[in-house]
Protein backbone atom coordinates (compact mmCIF):
# COMPACT_ATOMS: atom_id res chain seq x y z
CA UNK A 1 0.00 0.00 0.00
CA UNK A 2 1.29 3.45 -0.91
CA UNK A 3 -0.06 6.53 0.80
CA UNK A 4 0.68 10.24 0.64
CA UNK A 5 0.92 12.65 3.55
CA UNK A 6 -0.03 16.30 3.36
CA UNK A 7 -0.06 18.77 6.21
CA UNK A 8 -0.20 22.49 6.97
CA UNK A 9 -1.93 23.72 3.82
CA UNK A 10 -2.82 26.93 5.69
CA UNK A 11 -5.31 28.25 3.17
CA UNK A 12 -2.85 28.11 0.26
CA UNK A 13 -5.04 26.73 -2.52
CA UNK A 14 -2.43 26.94 -5.28
CA UNK A 15 0.02 24.83 -3.28
CA UNK A 16 -2.68 22.30 -2.39
CA UNK A 17 -3.83 22.00 -5.99
CA UNK A 18 -0.25 21.48 -7.18
CA UNK A 19 0.37 18.72 -4.65
CA UNK A 20 -2.93 16.93 -5.27
CA UNK A 21 -2.40 17.10 -9.04
CA UNK A 22 1.00 15.48 -8.58
CA UNK A 23 -0.47 12.76 -6.35
CA UNK A 24 -3.29 12.07 -8.81
CA UNK A 25 -0.93 11.94 -11.79
CA UNK A 26 1.21 9.28 -10.09
CA UNK A 27 -1.68 6.78 -10.09
CA UNK A 28 0.07 4.62 -7.46
CA UNK A 29 -1.21 6.35 -4.30
CA UNK A 30 -4.02 4.48 -2.55
CA UNK A 31 -4.72 6.93 0.27
CA UNK A 32 -3.95 10.47 1.40
CA UNK A 33 -3.56 11.34 5.08
CA UNK A 34 -4.06 15.02 5.85
CA UNK A 35 -2.52 16.07 9.16
CA UNK A 36 -4.36 19.32 9.74
CA UNK A 37 -3.96 23.09 9.72
CA UNK A 38 -5.80 23.29 6.43
CA UNK A 39 -7.02 26.78 7.27
CA UNK A 40 -5.51 29.88 8.84
CA UNK A 41 -2.74 32.20 7.59
CA UNK A 42 -3.72 31.92 3.89
CA UNK A 43 -7.01 33.44 2.71
CA UNK A 44 -8.43 30.76 0.39
CA UNK A 45 -10.17 28.90 3.18
CA UNK A 46 -13.32 27.80 1.38
CA UNK A 47 -11.52 26.75 -1.82
CA UNK A 48 -9.14 24.60 0.22
CA UNK A 49 -11.94 22.98 2.22
CA UNK A 50 -14.06 22.36 -0.87
CA UNK A 51 -11.13 20.61 -2.51
CA UNK A 52 -10.26 18.36 0.43
CA UNK A 53 -13.75 17.48 1.65
CA UNK A 54 -14.70 16.54 -1.91
CA UNK A 55 -12.20 13.66 -1.99
CA UNK A 56 -13.06 10.13 -0.91
CA UNK A 57 -9.42 8.99 -0.76
CA UNK A 58 -8.42 11.35 2.05
CA UNK A 59 -8.55 10.94 5.83
CA UNK A 60 -7.80 13.99 7.91
CA UNK A 61 -7.27 15.26 11.40
CA UNK A 62 -7.46 18.70 13.02
CA UNK A 63 -4.51 20.99 13.59
CA UNK A 64 -4.20 23.74 16.17
CA UNK A 65 -5.21 26.50 13.71
CA UNK A 66 -8.27 24.55 12.60
CA UNK A 67 -9.36 24.12 16.21
CA UNK A 68 -8.60 27.72 17.19
CA UNK A 69 -10.62 29.10 14.27
CA UNK A 70 -13.52 26.82 15.14
CA UNK A 71 -13.38 28.06 18.73
CA UNK A 72 -14.10 31.54 17.33
CA UNK A 73 -16.93 30.16 15.17
CA UNK A 74 -18.38 28.17 18.08
CA UNK A 75 -18.00 30.94 20.65
CA UNK A 76 -15.86 28.76 22.92
CA UNK A 77 -12.69 29.90 24.74
CA UNK A 78 -9.75 30.77 22.49
CA UNK A 79 -6.18 29.63 23.32
CA UNK A 80 -4.09 32.25 25.12
CA UNK A 81 -0.88 31.21 23.36
CA UNK A 82 -2.29 32.29 19.98
CA UNK A 83 -4.10 35.48 21.02
CA UNK A 84 -1.38 38.06 20.37
CA UNK A 85 -0.30 36.69 17.01
CA UNK A 86 -3.40 35.13 15.46
CA UNK A 87 -6.68 36.13 17.13
CA UNK A 88 -7.65 38.98 14.80
CA UNK A 89 -6.64 36.95 11.76
CA UNK A 90 -8.58 33.92 13.00
CA UNK A 91 -11.63 36.13 13.50
CA UNK A 92 -11.31 37.24 9.87
CA UNK A 93 -11.02 33.63 8.67
CA UNK A 94 -14.00 32.60 10.82
CA UNK A 95 -16.04 35.47 9.38
CA UNK A 96 -15.38 34.28 5.84
CA UNK A 97 -15.71 30.55 6.50
CA UNK A 98 -18.69 29.00 4.72
CA UNK A 99 -21.16 27.51 7.19
CA UNK A 100 -21.36 24.28 5.19
CA UNK A 101 -17.94 23.30 6.59
CA UNK A 102 -18.71 23.89 10.28
CA UNK A 103 -19.90 20.38 11.08
CA UNK A 104 -17.08 18.58 9.28
CA UNK A 105 -14.42 20.78 10.87
CA UNK A 106 -15.91 20.31 14.32
CA UNK A 107 -15.88 16.52 13.88
CA UNK A 108 -12.26 16.12 12.81
CA UNK A 109 -10.34 13.79 15.14
CA UNK A 110 -6.98 14.72 16.65
CA UNK A 111 -5.22 11.57 15.54
CA UNK A 112 -5.59 8.47 13.39
CA UNK A 113 -4.11 5.08 14.27
CA UNK A 114 -3.61 2.43 11.60
CA UNK A 115 -1.79 -0.86 11.19
CA UNK A 116 -0.04 -0.77 7.82
CA UNK A 117 2.12 -3.67 6.62
CA UNK A 118 2.15 -4.99 10.19
CA UNK A 119 3.40 -1.70 11.68
CA UNK A 120 1.53 0.60 14.05
CA UNK A 121 1.28 4.04 12.46
CA UNK A 122 0.16 7.17 14.28
CA UNK A 123 -0.93 10.23 12.29
CA UNK A 124 -1.10 13.34 14.50
CA UNK A 125 -0.66 17.08 13.92
CA UNK A 126 1.90 17.28 16.74
CA UNK A 127 2.44 15.68 20.13
CA UNK A 128 -0.47 15.88 22.54
CA UNK A 129 0.23 14.16 25.85
CA UNK A 130 -2.09 11.21 26.39
CA UNK A 131 -3.77 12.91 29.36
CA UNK A 132 -4.56 15.95 27.17
CA UNK A 133 -6.00 14.17 24.14
CA UNK A 134 -9.52 15.28 25.03
CA UNK A 135 -8.59 18.74 26.36
CA UNK A 136 -10.15 21.71 24.59
CA UNK A 137 -7.95 23.95 22.43
CA UNK A 138 -7.95 26.77 25.01
CA UNK A 139 -6.21 24.36 27.41
CA UNK A 140 -3.29 24.32 24.94
CA UNK A 141 -3.08 20.54 24.47
CA UNK A 142 -0.41 20.64 21.75
CA UNK A 143 3.11 20.37 23.14
CA UNK A 144 5.61 23.19 22.54
CA UNK A 145 7.70 22.76 19.39
CA UNK A 146 11.06 21.13 20.05
CA UNK A 147 14.32 21.08 18.12
CA UNK A 148 14.53 18.78 15.10
CA UNK A 149 16.77 16.01 16.38
CA UNK A 150 16.43 12.37 17.29
CA UNK A 151 16.73 12.77 21.07
CA UNK A 152 14.11 15.52 21.16
CA UNK A 153 11.71 13.44 19.04
CA UNK A 154 12.22 10.40 21.28
CA UNK A 155 11.40 12.43 24.39
CA UNK A 156 8.53 14.33 22.76
CA UNK A 157 6.64 11.22 21.64
CA UNK A 158 7.72 8.93 24.50
CA UNK A 159 4.11 8.26 25.55
CA UNK A 160 2.99 7.13 22.10
CA UNK A 161 2.75 3.42 21.22
CA UNK A 162 3.59 3.32 17.51
CA UNK A 163 6.30 2.12 15.17
CA UNK A 164 5.94 5.15 12.91
CA UNK A 165 4.77 8.60 13.99
CA UNK A 166 3.86 11.00 11.20
CA UNK A 167 3.21 14.63 12.09
CA UNK A 168 3.38 18.24 10.91
CA UNK A 169 2.94 21.57 12.71
CA UNK A 170 6.45 23.03 12.61
CA UNK A 171 6.60 23.24 8.78
CA UNK A 172 10.01 21.56 8.55
CA UNK A 173 10.88 18.36 6.71
CA UNK A 174 12.70 15.81 8.85
CA UNK A 175 12.90 12.09 9.58
CA UNK A 176 14.51 10.29 12.50
CA UNK A 177 14.77 6.63 13.53
CA UNK A 178 15.74 5.87 17.13
CA UNK A 179 15.54 2.08 16.52
CA UNK A 180 12.26 1.86 18.46
CA UNK A 181 10.19 4.38 16.52
CA UNK A 182 10.49 6.29 13.29
CA UNK A 183 9.43 9.95 13.18
CA UNK A 184 8.51 11.68 9.92
CA UNK A 185 7.43 15.23 9.15
CA UNK A 186 6.88 15.88 5.42
CA UNK A 187 7.05 19.66 5.72
CA UNK A 188 4.26 22.15 5.04
CA UNK A 189 2.28 22.14 1.80
CA UNK A 190 1.28 25.78 2.11
CA UNK A 191 4.10 27.33 4.13
CA UNK A 192 7.26 25.77 2.78
CA UNK A 193 10.34 27.96 3.10
CA UNK A 194 11.35 27.22 -0.49
CA UNK A 195 9.69 27.83 -3.87
CA UNK A 196 8.05 24.38 -4.04
CA UNK A 197 5.01 22.81 -2.38
CA UNK A 198 6.03 19.64 -0.54
CA UNK A 199 4.37 16.44 0.64
CA UNK A 200 5.37 12.96 1.75
Where are these regions (language model features)?
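Beta-strand-turn-beta hairpins that frame and shape the catalytic cleft
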Residues: 1-4, 113-122, 178-182
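Short, glycine/charged-enriched secondary-structure capping and boundary segments
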Residues: 18-21, 47-50, 74-77, 137-138, ...
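Active-site neighborhood of divalent metal-dependent phosphoester bond hydrolases
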Residues: 55-113, 141-158
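Di-metal (Zn2+ and/or Mg2+/Mn2+) metal-binding site signature of metallo-dependent hydrolases
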Residues: 38-48, 65-68, 171-175
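Internal, conserved structured core segments that host functional sites
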Residues: 105-141
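N-terminal active-site segment of His-dependent metallophosphoesterases
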Residues: 1-58
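Active-site neighborhood of phospho(di)ester-bond hydrolases with catalytic His/Asp-centered motifs
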Residues: 6-7, 32-37, 59-64, 124, ...
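Conserved beta-sheet core of the metallophosphoesterase superfamily
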Residues: 147-200
